[in-house]
């Protein structure tokens, strides 16, 4: 676990031994601060001083920042989903900016569709606000299809939709935040990019929302592979069971108790099982077409060695 504690003349900070989340130290002329994300202190006049290594322990005093334990860079296993979804756009983790990664990720998805003959004939590429937007911009830039915003996010009073503990409230928050631009929806063929497909309930409502507003076709691209496991390290997910995940529900229905043996095949949409999973999710969400970013594509977009990244929610590897 990450740790903060007071110790006499200073505060002591420790980054978790595998560095699953960052700890960033900021500095200005009159002192230091510590945050999960650098943008949190930039408006206060601090600049990034350092990122703690996995397991590193520092003490901040009136005299400066002292390293009490060096940590071990070789144990790095930072959460990949920080770039795909959770991170703020201008946050920088291990030298990689979130917005840059997302744009590059969209470009890779478009390249894959072009290479595999799956680039659809649509009027616009669009992103599910907020985190889906830069993925979509990258896809639009690489594919040559115009980018548009057929619905706008209304943010006052509404939190991020994954935060409420109740699924009904999560759906309500997601629905209330989106306001349609009818001219960009009615009679149009649209390709949307979202950061992920977890349970599928909010996605289903978004697709229905688009059809109700006159969309002719709704294609979807997921900016990461199918979610196969709930996160057991950072407590990000509100899921109480992996059977809440739409991918696991479909696998369980198809394979029963043996389904866990075939997770790797289902995770890869190039395999027969992977294609069946993709097609069934596509059918349930009433999409015209659906493709997932591959794990390899996600890692390429981040630009770090896979051995330094936690990909547990996709492949179950610890």
PLM features per residue range, with description:
Residues 31-45, 59-121, 159, 163-170:
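Active-site-facing substrate-recognition patch
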Residues 141-189, 228-240:
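Short, glycine/charge-rich flexible loops or terminal/linker lids adjacent to PRPP-binding catalytic cores
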Residues 7, 17, 27-30, 53-64, ...:
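Short acidic-glycine loop/turn motifs at beta-strand connectors
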Residues 15, 45-51, 205-318:
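PRPP-dependent phosphoribosyltransferase catalytic core
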Residues 2-13:
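Single conserved hydrophobic/aromatic residue that forms the stacking wall/gate
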Residues 65-79, 127-129, 134-135, 141-149:
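Terminal amphipathic helices with adjacent charged low-complexity linkers/tails
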């Amino acid at each position: 676990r990450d740790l903060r504690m007071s110790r006499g003349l200073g505060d002591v900070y420790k980054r978790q031994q595998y560095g699953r989340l960052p700890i960033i130290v900021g500095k200005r002329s009159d002192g230091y601060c510590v945050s999960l994300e650098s943008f949190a202190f930039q408006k206060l006049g601090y600049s990034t001083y350092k990122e703690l290594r996995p397991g590193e322990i520092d003490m901040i005093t009136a005299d400066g920042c002292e390293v009490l334990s060096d940590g071990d860079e070789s144990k790095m296993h930072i959460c990949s989903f920080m770039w795909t979804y959770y991170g703020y756009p201008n946050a920088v983790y291990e030298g990689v900016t979130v917005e840059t990664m997302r744009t590059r990720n969209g470009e890779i998805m478009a390249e894959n569709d072009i290479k595999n003959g799956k680039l659809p004939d649509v009027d616009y590429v669009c992103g599910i606000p907020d985190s889906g937007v830069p993925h979509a911009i990258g896809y639009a830039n690489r594919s040559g299809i115009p980018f548009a915003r057929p619905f706008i996010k209304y943010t006052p009073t509404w939190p991020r939709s994954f935060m409420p503990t109740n699924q009904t409230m999560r759906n309500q928050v997601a629905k209330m935040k989106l306001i349609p631009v009818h001219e960009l929806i009615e009679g149009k063929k649209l390709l949307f990019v979202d950061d992920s497909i977890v349970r599928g309930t909010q996605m289903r409502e978004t697709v229905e929302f688009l059809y109700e507003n006159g969309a002719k076709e709704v294609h979807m691209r997921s900016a990461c592979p199918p979610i196969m496991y709930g996160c057991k390290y950072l407590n990000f997910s509100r899921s109480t069971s992996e059977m809440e995940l739409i991918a696991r529900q479909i696998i369980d229905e198809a394979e029963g108790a043996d389904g866990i043996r075939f997770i790797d095949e289902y995770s890869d949409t190039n395999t027969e099982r992977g294609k069946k999973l993709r097609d069934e999710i596509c059918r349930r969400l009433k999409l015209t077409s659906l493709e997932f970013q591959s794990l390899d594509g996600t890692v390429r977009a981040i630009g770090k060695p896979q051995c330094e990244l936690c990909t547990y929610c996709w492949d179950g590897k610890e």
